[in-house]
Amino acid sequence: MASRAQNRRPAQEVDNTISYVQCDGLAAMKMVKHCHEESRSNMEVAQGALLGLVVDDRLEITNCFPFPKSSDETIDEEEYQLNMMRRLRLVNVDHFHVGWYQSADVGNFLSLPLLESQYHYQTSIEESVVVIYDTQKSARGFLTLKAYRLTPQAIAMYKEEKFTPEALRNLKVGYENLFIEIPIVIKNSALCNIMMSEMKEMVPEEEGTHFLDLGTASVLENHLRCLMDRVDELNQEANKFNKYQQTVIRQEQDKHRMLAKHAQENAARIAKGEAAIPDEEVQKLFRPLPVPSRLNPMIVSGQINTYAQHISQFCSQSLAKLYMTQALQGAKENKQ
């Protein structure tokens, strides 16, 4: 799958609307805090709005606020967002809507709701982005904030609302070119940088032994379970499409037999001097079958590719730790 992604990447159209995203440290901390709070409350995803402004080819994110998580359907989310931006405007905070953010696990954020939401955002706000925060990877010490935009091919696919194999092939759309990643940088004020430099001196130095922790079975097990679930789902989608193709083949065979029989009957009628029956009567009996959507299998394929990449990277790191631990253990035994 990775080689397939590399082969198809050059055909991707380039979106030059935004060159990079600049995020204030305060907005980044708000996103991190919200996502971790929701992950501890067993909520699937945390979502919120991004506020800022566009300067030339730079999108600046200066503030954010979470979306309501109430299950009450009477709450109007659009009205809630408008009220929030109206109140932020009263206190002289940037109130322009420039996108939204969402939490994700092990970087696997690709889903149908996210695609639809970003399409509506990007068609109404051209410069909008979606920022993905990986809670699990950040909890292991790697801050993961990534900004994405839909590619022109993905937008064209949604505009046409055709997810058949022919339509996807003509648009050259695959899971590897649904999104384009936009570089994101975090900017702090000079006073914040000075304070963080002082705090760094106050933090005691770690010995670094926790980096050699080999208790990675739970993480790898979770990755493999998710990968197996996605493979099973993709297998079910493949079976559905195979059944559709078999049904189409049987219908075509029945249609040809009926047309051949109809031609013989017409020949007999003509020989008797009677008028031939038009073929439209037979054509009406065999209406084209609806083509199943290939959007969901494409998304599942992208999820499988993401899990496979994470497992490969994780195993490489674990092997490096294992060799380092083996060398340290050997050195310790030699000293004894």
UniProtKB/Swiss-Prot annotation:
The entry's localization annotation reads: Cytoplasm
- Signal peptide residues are none
For this protein, the record's Gene3D superfamilies field holds:
Cytidine Deaminase, domain 2
Instruction: Please state the protein's primary subcellular location.
Output: cytoplasm
Give a Pfam family name. Answer: JAB
Q: Which GO terms describe its biological process?
A: formation of cytoplasmic translation initiation complex
Is Ion transport among the key words of this record?
no
Mind listing the UniProt keywords for this protein, alphabetically?
Cytoplasm, Initiation factor, Protein biosynthesis
**Which SMART domains does this chain map to?**
JAB_MPN
Keyword Protein biosynthesis (UniProt): yes
GO molecular function terms here?
Answer: metallopeptidase activity; translation initiation factor activity
Function, as annotated: Component of the eukaryotic translation initiation factor 3 (eIF-3) complex, which is involved in protein synthesis of a specialized repertoire of mRNAs and, together with other initiation factors, stimulates binding of mRNA and methionyl-tRNAi to the 40S ribosome. The eIF-3 complex specifically targets and initiates translation of a subset of mRNAs involved in cell proliferation.
Could you identify this protein by its name?
Eukaryotic translation initiation factor 3 subunit H
Protein species of origin: Aedes aegypti (Yellowfever mosquito)
